């Protein structure tokens, strides 16, 4: 692919560098050890992960609030499991989840090698739809903070990917152009189309098997991504 003229590389965080599924699973494992549920963690996660993904899509589209997202993903999972969970229990689990999640530091295999290879050739930044404090804790606790000049969260900017404004404001703050920038992320809708629509280049890290497309290069590992640079 053509990388000539690129000065700035923007990464998504969750599902791209930070291994969300692994860290989320460990978070729920900790919660399950504290609370007594009549089903296994594996069964819970089988329902929770796709529900969480669907709720995040609704959140990106401004169809639900942050509070709705946090409540619905648990409530709908318990409904699938035919488990009667009170509002108080759901809120308790949600608070524990938010508190514990960012303490787990696991990155996708090859993350540090990739960032080390790029840090002296490009300016590196993050654009994430995650919540400000939580994302900052994730970055700090996983040991990658020093690689990035700017971290843009939807909460801070006021717009979620794929809204044009989060890309426009990020490019302006970094003092670069769309033509000199590339976006790397796992979400075709939020990361790839959002960036391409603003004139940026993009690489799709297809970490959870979205549909194949021809809009930009697709990679399935960070080692494969590193080879493109």
Named regions from a protein language model:
Residues 39, 85, 105, 122, ...:
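Secondary-structure boundary/capping signal
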């Amino acid at each position: 692919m053509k990388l000539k003229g690129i000065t700035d590389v923007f990464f998504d965080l969750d599902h791209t560098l930070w291994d969300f599924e692994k860290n989320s699973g460990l978070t729920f494992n900790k919660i399950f050890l504290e609370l007594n549920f009549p089903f296994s963690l594996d069964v819970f996660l089988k329902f929770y992960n796709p529900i969480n993904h669907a709720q995040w899509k609704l959140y990106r589209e401004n169809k639900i609030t942050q509070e709705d997202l946090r409540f619905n993903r648990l409530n709908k999972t318990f409904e699938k499991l035919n488990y009667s969970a009170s509002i108080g229990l759901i809120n308790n689990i949600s608070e524990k989840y938010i508190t514990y999640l960012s303490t787990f530091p696991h990155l996708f295999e090859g993350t540090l090698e990739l960032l080390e290879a790029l840090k002296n050739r490009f300016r590196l930044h993050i654009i994430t739809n995650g919540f400000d404090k939580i994302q900052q804790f994730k970055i700090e606790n996983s040991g990658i903070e020093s690689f990035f000049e700017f971290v843009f969260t939807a909460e801070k900017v006021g717009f979620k990917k794929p809204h044009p404004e989060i890309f426009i404001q990020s490019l302006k703050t970094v003092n670069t152009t769309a033509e000199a920038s590339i976006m790397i992320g796992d979400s075709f809708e939020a990361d790839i189309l959002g960036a391409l629509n603003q004139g940026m280049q993009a690489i799709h890290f297809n970490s959870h098997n979205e549909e194949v497309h021809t809009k930009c290069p697709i990679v399935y590992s960070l080692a494969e991504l590193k080879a493109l640079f």
